[in-house]
Structures are given as structure tokens and as C-alpha cells.
């Protein structure tokens, strides 16, 4: 958070109970479309995993290797352009009709997407050398690379979609993104089923078909939101695509100043999960396939606190923009409570009914899947242990982004994930012979450390803005 907080806002006195209740209602109203939008995004990947899983364990392992690497780079670039969200929220907090400010930010979000995606395309095209360097089997590395050569073209339209999604979220109108994402699920499922297995006259394309379906779906999502911004009277007045070619260097620099630490924070978190995939690959195909199933389930539940983290970014950002310290606290803690509460419930369900979740991704009646299923049950029980802290760190990070605090949280994430989580997981897995279980315990420890550190930093910010308001 910078030192420009203006505590000039004074709101009529409202009881604490009413304030908490009102903020909870607002968080839920804004949050559920964001949550289901996140789930829709996860469902696109989950649909591909379900289809590809029917092609065999080795093919699933190849897809996991490729998508894990792709998503690591995608998350980095997505984190960069997601700086659009707090910047717009703060601008609207200062002035509800900041048309020019909003337009400048969105345009530079598009510019940033183009700037970052070109070098990433080069890296993705040559990923086979990276996979072999990391010790993956040559046959799996080759299949993963073939998959990547179709999947990578989804990146640019997806980043454009993220820019517009951030715009709609900051405007507190996320229903449009939910509508587009929901339509994309059906489109991706139909396209994947058609191209992967060969229907409606198409030859079976396997992994290539999955990549083509994802690229087409990402393009559809961007075009859908772009159409709404161009046609809807509420958004058309921003002229987001007008004079697109004009540079705006001050705004571009500001976006990168906020967004680059966000991008690195996202990468530190997601890359530790990619490192876990690499370590699982060294243990064996069974561990890797079981990890693929368990991590997919955990990722789906994570979409809920991620949504409440986005709510926190918008609500905290707007309160920060208008200089209201009490609203900052209520907005942040309300989203925090909702995110952590949901993850606690999901952790209980993962322990009580793991086979229900696993059966979505594996045929439980196939004897060949029994070793994978048994190991996935164990991994899912361990995932339940870190559900609460995972939710806490996700929402706390969103709260801090609403204050434009991204650099120190980046360092906290680096320490927690790579200073604690990964080394501990590697030692437990390979030095103490715990295998995949040790890797999952390390992940839990890293998430817990980040959650504690970010929550402490948030509390310090609250103390600071309260002191400024009282001065």
C-alpha cells in the first residue's frame, strides 16, 4: 500500500451487526457470480481431463505435464493483466464516473497481454527440451509437446478475456462474465468430445483435439465479453477499443508496477504445484495419475476462496479509493470469513466421501485403476488438511491487492512456497521415503506459512489506516 491514503470519507453511524450483515450480503451477491465464473474456468480444464483420462494413464500423465507448465506461464501473464481490477476499483472509489481513468487502464491491460504473450509462445513451442531436462520420460515429453503446440494458441485470447473480466468485476457487474463462461463450458465440452474422440465426421485427434477445443473456447469467451462492452449502453460509453494503438506509457508503467508482483506471486504458488508434478513423475506414473486426480479436485474447491479474494480486491479497493477505513476492514474480513468457512466445509467432505469425488475422474469399476484410486484417496485426505489455510491465503492476498500492496506479499509467497513448502516436500518424499505423501505434506506447510504471514500484514495495514483516520 502506498502512502497516499486519504481518510476524508465519513459515513453515517451504523451498528456493527448491521454493518457486518450488509457487507456479508454484498460479498455474497458479488461473490457468487465470480465464484461460478472461476468454477466455469476450472470446468474447462476438468472437462479435458475427464475426456483425456479415458485415453489411458500415460496419455493423462502427458496432458498433466503439458497443462501444468502451460498454466504456470498462463497464471504469470494473467496475474500481470489482473492489475486492471484493483486499479479500476480504486479509481471508481474516488470517482464513480471515472470514464477516462477506466478506459486508460483497460487499454493498457490489452497492451500488456500482447507484450507478454509473444515471448511465452516461444517458450511453450520449445517445451520438450525443458521436460527432458527435468527428467521426464521421452515418450511422455514428446506427447506433451505435441499437445502444447495446439494448446498454446489459447493464451492470447484468454488474456484479453481476463482483462475484460477484471473490468466487469471492478464495475461490480460480474454476471456478464458468468454468462459467457457458462456458455463456454458447453461449447468446450462439445468441441472436446467431437475432436478428441472423433464425432460428426471428424477423425479422432486425441490430445490435439483437446488443445484445439480449448483455443476455440478461449477465443469465444473474449469475443463474447467484447461484444457486450461494445453493445451494452452501460459499458459502451467507455470506448474500450477506441484508439487502441495509442500508447499510454505512464498508465502502462503503473500497471506493470502493480501487476508484475501479482504475476510473480501467482507463479510462486502455481509453480510449486508444477514442481510437485515433476517430483511425482520421478516417483512413477501411478503417483502422477493419482496426483492429477487429487489436485484437480482441490483446484475446483479453491475457485470459491479465489472468488472471495476477487470480491475483497474490489470492495477493499473501492473503500480505499474513497478513504473509508472502516469499510476497508468490513470488506476484507467479510470475504475472509466466507472463503475460510467454505474451505473448512470442503475439507470435511474430502475426508468423508473421497470416492465420490474421485469417481468423477476415474472409472472405479476398472481393476486397473485401483492403485491410482487408493493413492488418490490418501492424497485427497492430505488436501483436506490445507483447505482452510489455502482459502485464507487466497482471500488475504486479494485483500492486500485492494490496497495496491503487491510487492511484499510477493516476497512472502516466495518464502512460504519455495523456502518452506518445496524443500520440506522434497526432503519428506525422497530423504524420508514418504513418496507422494511427503510432497503433499510439504504443500500444506507452504500454504499455511503464506496464509499466516499475509494475514498478519493485513492486520498491520488496518492498524495503519485506522491511525491515519484518527489523526
From Swiss-Prot:
Broad class of where this protein is predominantly found: membrane
Cell location: Cell inner membrane
PANTHER family: FMN_FAD EXPORTER YEEO-RELATED (PTHR43298:SF2), MULTIDRUG RESISTANCE PROTEIN NORM-RELATED (PTHR43298)
A cellular-component GO term for this protein: plasma membrane
Bilayer topology: Multi-pass membrane protein
Function recorded in the entry: Multidrug efflux pump.
Domain of life: Bacteria
InterPro entries: MATE_fam, MATE_MdtK, MdtK-like
Listed GO biological process terms: monoatomic ion transport
Stored Pfam families: MatE (PF01554)
Membrane-spanning segments: 30-52, 67-89, 110-132, 147-169, 176-198, 208-230, 255-277, 287-309, 330-352, 372-389, 410-432, 436-458
Keyword GTP-binding attributed: no
Biological source species: Brucella suis biovar 1 (strain 1330)
A single MF term (Gene Ontology): antiporter activity
Family from the record: Belongs to the multi antimicrobial extrusion (MATE) (TC 2.A.66.1) family.
Keyword terms of this UniProt record: Antiport, Cell inner membrane, Cell membrane, Ion transport, Membrane, Transmembrane, Transmembrane helix, Transport
Protein name: Probable multidrug resistance protein NorM
Amino acid at each position: 500500500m502506498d502512502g497516499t491514503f486519504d481518510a476524508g470519507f465519513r459515513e453515517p453511524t451504523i451498528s456493527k451487526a448491521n454493518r457486518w450483515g450488509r457487507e456479508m450480503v454484498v460479498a455474497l451477491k458479488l461473490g457468487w457470480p465470480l465464484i461460478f465464473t472461476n468454477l466455469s474456468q476450472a470446468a474447462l480444464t476438468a472437462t479435458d481431463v475427464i475426456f483425456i483420462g479415458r485415453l489411458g494413464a500415460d496419455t493423462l500423465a502427458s496432458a498433466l505435464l503439458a497443462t501444468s507448465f502451460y498454466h504456470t506461464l498462463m497464471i504469470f501473464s494473467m496475474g500481470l493483466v489482473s492489475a486492471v481490477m484493483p486499479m479500476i476499483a480504486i479509481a471508481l472509489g474516488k470517482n464513480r464516473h471515472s470514464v477516462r481513468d477506466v478506459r486508460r487502464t483497460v487499454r493498457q491491460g490489452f497492451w500488456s497481454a500482447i507484450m507478454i504473450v509473444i515471448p511465452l509462445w516461444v517458450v511453450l513451442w520449445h517445451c520438450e527440451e525443458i521436460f527432458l531436462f527435468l527428467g521426464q520420460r521421452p515418450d511422455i515429453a514428446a506427447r506433451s509437446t505435441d499437445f502444447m503446440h495446439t494448446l498454446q494458441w489459447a493464451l492470447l485470447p484468454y488474456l484479453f478475456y481476463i482483462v475484460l473480466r477484471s473490468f466487469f468485476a471492478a464495475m461490480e457487474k460480474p454476471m456478464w462474465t458468468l454468462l459467457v463462461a457458462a456458455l463456454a463450458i458447453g461449447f468446450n465440452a462439445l468441441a472436446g468430445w467431437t475432436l478428441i474422440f472423433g464425432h460428426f465426421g471428424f477423425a479422432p485427434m486425441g490430445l490435439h483435439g483437446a488443445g484445439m477445443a480449448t483455443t476455440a473456447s478461449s477465443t469465444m469467451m473474449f469475443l463474447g465479453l467484447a461484444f457486450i462492452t461494445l453493445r451494452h449502453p452501460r459499458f459502451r460509453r467507455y470506448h474500450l477499443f477506441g484508439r487502441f494503438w495509442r500508447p499510454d506509457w505512464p498508465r502502462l508503467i503503473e500497471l506493470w508496477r502493480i501487476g508484475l508482483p501479482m504475476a510473480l506471486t501467482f507463479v510462486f504458488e502455481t509453480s510449486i504445484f508444477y514442481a510437485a508434478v515433476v517430483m511425482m513423475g520421478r516417483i512413477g506414473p501411478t503417483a502422477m495419475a493419482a496426483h492429477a486426480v487429487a489436485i484437480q479436485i482441490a483446484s475446483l474447491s479453491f475457485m470459491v476462496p479465489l472468488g472471495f479474494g476477487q470480491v475483497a480486491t474490489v470492495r477493499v479497493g473501492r473503500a480505499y479509493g474513497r478513504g473509508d477505513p472502516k469499510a476497508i476492514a468490513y470488506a476484507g474480513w467479510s470475504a475472509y470469513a466466507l472463503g475460510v468457512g467454505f474451505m473448512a466445509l470442503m475439507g470435511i467432505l474430502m475426508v468423508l466421501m473421497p470416492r465420490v469425488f474421485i469417481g468423477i475422474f476415474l472409472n472405479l469399476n476398472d481393476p486397473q485403476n485401483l492403485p491410482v484410486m487408493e493413492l488418490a484417496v490418501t492424497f485427497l485426505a492430505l488436501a483436506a488438511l490445507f483447505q482452510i489455510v489455502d482459502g485464507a491465503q487466497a482471500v488475504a492476498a486479494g485483500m492486500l491487492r485492494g490496497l495496491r500492496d503487491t510487492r511484499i506479499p510477493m516476497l512472502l509467497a516466495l518464502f512460504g512456497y519455495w523456502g518452506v513448502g518445496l524443500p520440506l516436500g522434497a526432503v519428506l518424499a525422497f530423504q524420508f521415503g514418504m513418496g507422494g505423501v511427503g510432497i503433499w505434506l510439504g504443500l500444506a506447510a507452504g500454504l499455511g506459512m503464506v496464509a499466516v504471514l499475509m494475514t498478519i500484514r493485513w492486520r498491520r495495514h488496518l492498524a495503519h489506516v485506522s491511525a491515519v483516520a484518527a489523526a
